[in-house]
């Protein structure tokens, strides 16, 4: 059999194989066995060197034509098989577009924001205003208007981040007291406000202290405001946040802007009349007291006619009690394993 006959026989054989092939893998095997380095067509073409020089152009042209025809047939068959495979796959993987799609992870309110919202809602229901102050405050409103003149020894109680000699990161939301009293028209009734926000002190971070923490200032100024009003206000707040059963303890303290001044502790654990005092674990949550007459005077309010109470509470500490968290630093570590425990319903 000469080369021409071999080429014609190969063309017929491969054409039949292409027609019968039923998968992309089979058609690829045909291509390799035909055109690969050791393929059938390659072997035949190696015999061209032994032909008479006059036959070489004729046989070479014939071989190239058959090669082109077979490559075209393989390509077309492969395309058909790929389309059939895709159609079969689509038919077997029907998508029900009425089913819900994949949900994306979304952010939720931080646990401290949740506590702050609960506290705000409580006081709004009691007729208070919510006033947001500035985190960068002046020395005048942060200290002087709070009865802390520049030479006052109590300034040493608070290590402060100063930006300039007269501008600082506020150390307390109490700075909002003077601004609120300056703006309020007392002819319309008493001033009742809370002011939530971040405060900054040069504290060493530990389990219960942080250089940056949240605080909510409360202030009521009006006629005949008493210490009993303050105690009742704080008891109502803790009962709503924690439920009844957490003991509250008032200790005498000192703050330059209140007189008398109190430290208020709340029990970690719930207690009843049978709980022994040594079994109660306390955590300090706020400072409070009656507004100092000097603070009222600096706001042009007559302390003989008006009185008031103020308190500053830490929502961080409230969250620790509410959820049994023993280290305040957990709130600021951005650990999703911790924070996801406090997702609200619907989030």
From Swiss-Prot:
Superkingdom field: Bacteria
E.C. no: 6.1.1.20
Parts forming coiled coils: none
GO biological process: phenylalanyl-tRNA aminoacylation
Localization of this protein: Cytoplasm
UniProt KW keywords: Aminoacyl-tRNA synthetase, ATP-binding, Cytoplasm, Ligase, Magnesium, Metal-binding, Nucleotide-binding, Protein biosynthesis
Cofactor details (free text): Binds 2 magnesium ions per tetramer.
Pfam families xrefs: Phe_tRNA-synt_N (PF02912), tRNA-synt_2d (PF01409)
Gene3D superfamilies: Bira Bifunctional Protein, Domain 2 (3.30.930.10)
Catalytic activity: tRNA(Phe) + L-phenylalanine + ATP = L-phenylalanyl-tRNA(Phe) + AMP + diphosphate + H(+)
Main localization of the protein described in the UniProt heading: cytoplasm
Residues given in the record as Mg(2+) binding sites: 259
Cellular component aspect of the GO annotation: cytoplasm
SUPFAM superfamilies, per database record: Class II aaRS and biotin synthetases, tRNA-binding arm
MF terms (GO), sorted A to Z: ATP binding; catalytic activity, acting on a protein; magnesium ion binding; phenylalanine-tRNA ligase activity; transferase activity; tRNA binding
Cofactors demanded by this protein: Mg(2+)
Keyword Coiled coil on entry: no
Quaternary assembly: Tetramer of two alpha and two beta subunits.
UniProt family annotation: Belongs to the class-II aminoacyl-tRNA synthetase family. Phe-tRNA synthetase alpha subunit type 1 subfamily.
Protein name: Phenylalanine--tRNA ligase alpha subunit
Gene: pheS
